[in-house]
Amino acid sequence: MKELAQTAGVENVYVINTCAVTAEAVRKSKQEIRKQKRQFPEKQIIVTGCAAQIDPDSFAEMAEVNAVIGNTEKLSVDTWRGLSNGFIGQTERVQVDDIMSVTETAEHLIDGFGTRSRAYVQVQNGCDHRCTFCIIPFGRGNSRSVPAGVVVDQIKRLVDSGYNEVVLTGVDLTSWGADLPATPKLGDLVMRILKLVPDLNRLRISSIDSIEVDENLMQAIATEPRLMPHLHLSLQHGDDLILKRMKRRHLRDDAIQFCEEARKLRPDMIFGADIIAGFPTETEAHFENSVKLVDECDLTWLHVFPYSARQGTPAARMPAVDGRLIKERAAILRQKGDEKVQTHLRDQVGKVHAVLMENP
């Protein structure tokens, strides 16, 4: 976005890229808008991102906001030309189209990450699944994949530019390829990258859904030392009934089995996971199953979300857990996560690892 805005001649403007994962994220976005306007009243404010895509009117109604643009529009230089100095206020204040009609996701690939030695390549966007708690598909649209050839060419350019590590990212990364000819799998993409970009030192995968992991990805985990031994899993909960109410595609035993199999193939594999505390109807017994899952999967890095009702989602209509109890349960999970991190760090004492300086 920054490069597009600069190319279009946009100046003296604050662009706020919003998040919609939780109600708290939306609140903080609006708080930041008001803060920036107080501190820099002479600057125009343009709002974009998932929260703006999902509920543009709530931002357009703010006196501090000059323009609201959607997730597709923010990737178009023509949008930014229309918002360049002198034109804000003359174009439509809200420019947000139907994200569900978008079928392409390749044109926004980024070539520059400043002084960092790690680069990110978004190979997939959107999600075809409808978990009952999640609003993100309405901000990102349906699942769409970047063709493998485009991904490989992008990574070659990044490696030629000096990047030592590439991270593959996506909203629902393990669904990569489902919309492409011959429906390749994520493992096919990983193997192709490692084969065709031999000078790439490290390849890392961001958050995945373990139930969708394919055989080639498991083979890469077992045989490719350049594939980093760290996987972040979208687990969300440790109780089967809650997982069903979330409309997740896996059960508790599926998660445990995947972690056991992956660690057999790669003994140094480390897992992180997203876990939601206080999902509607969650009892103490349900919650305890999430706590136990941390040990049973031997998770090291926990990303704990206190449940946040998102308007329009099925979960928002389910019987809610008391807010204080949600916070208490989230705190217990975070404490559990802190303990797992400390255990992992103690286990590294005396060991030697090759490391990457992320920002030399």
Language model feature labels by segment:
Residues M1-W176, M191, N216, L231, ...:
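Proteins enriched for Cys/Gly/acidic motifs involved in redox and nucleic-acid/cofactor modification
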Residues L233, D274, V294, L302, ...:
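Hydrophobic, well-ordered secondary-structure elements that form the walls
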